[in-house]
């Protein structure tokens, strides 16, 4: 019997599985903490910069680095399927624009309250009285937003106008520490994560006469499976 076999024989299989599971959990926690720490550093940098500088820097980083990430291969593949008439150059232009927009949205995250603030000059509100009116009426309402530009600005603006009378739904980050950090920038927003529990909260909000807000393309994995992009 080799030394390795003797070690395996000395440790019960059940105990070994428990220790392996704990090791995986520790590795996952360490990775999550490292990811959250890196995000905190980046967000602190963007927060210290003027808004336009932060947005511009975020866009520059996205345009330069984003197209080289593995996700870009999937994006290009979907673009070719969705718009086969496009040239490869046009698809890559769209791809760079996508990364520019996403990176700007991330860089603007620490500035959301400032962007959505009354009198900031950054947001044009058309018929805002309709939203403020909903905040004082017992009739429930469902507010839909489009997932375009910096969609978080729309959410922040709706919550500023309606206050506690509106409840929104969001997709929680896979990393719980990152999720907690991102929610800190929305301290005044009432929101629930998508899913069964969040769905029950939304129904309760409507039954109580409140309003809910959500994006029109909120993804639910427990829906009906249909063919999409192959």
Spans of features found by a protein language model:
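Membrane-anchoring hydrophobic helices of lipid-metabolizing enzymes
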Residues: 2-145, 179-184, 188
């Amino acid at each position: 019997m080799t030394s390795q076999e003797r070690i395996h024989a000395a440790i019960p299989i059940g105990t070994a599985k428990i220790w392996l599971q704990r090791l995986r959990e520790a590795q996952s926690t360490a990775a999550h903490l490292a990811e959250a720490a890196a995000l905190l550093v980046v967000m602190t940098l963007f927060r210290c910069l003027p808004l336009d500088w932060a947005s511009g820097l975020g866009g520059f980083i996205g345009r330069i680095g984003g197209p080289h990430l593995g996700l870009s291969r999937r994006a290009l593949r979907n673009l070719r399927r969705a718009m086969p008439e496009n040239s490869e150059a046009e698809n890559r232009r769209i791809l760079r624009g996508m990364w520019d927009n996403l990176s700007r949205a991330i860089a603007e995250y620490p500035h959301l309250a400032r962007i959505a603030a009354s009198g900031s000059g950054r947001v044009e509100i058309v018929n805002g009285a309709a939203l403020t009116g909903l905040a004082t009426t017992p009739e429930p309402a469902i507010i839909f937003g489009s997932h375009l530009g910096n969609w978080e600005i729309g959410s922040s603006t709706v919550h500023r106008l309606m206050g506690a009378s509106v409840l929104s739904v969001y997709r929680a980050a896979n990393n719980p520490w990152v999720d907690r950090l991102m929610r800190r920038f929305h301290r005044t927003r009432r929101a629930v994560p998508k899913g069964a529990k969040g769905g029950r909260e939304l129904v309760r909000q409507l039954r109580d006469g409140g309003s809910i807000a959500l994006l029109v393309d909120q993804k639910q994995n427990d829906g009906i499976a249909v063919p999409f992009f192959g």
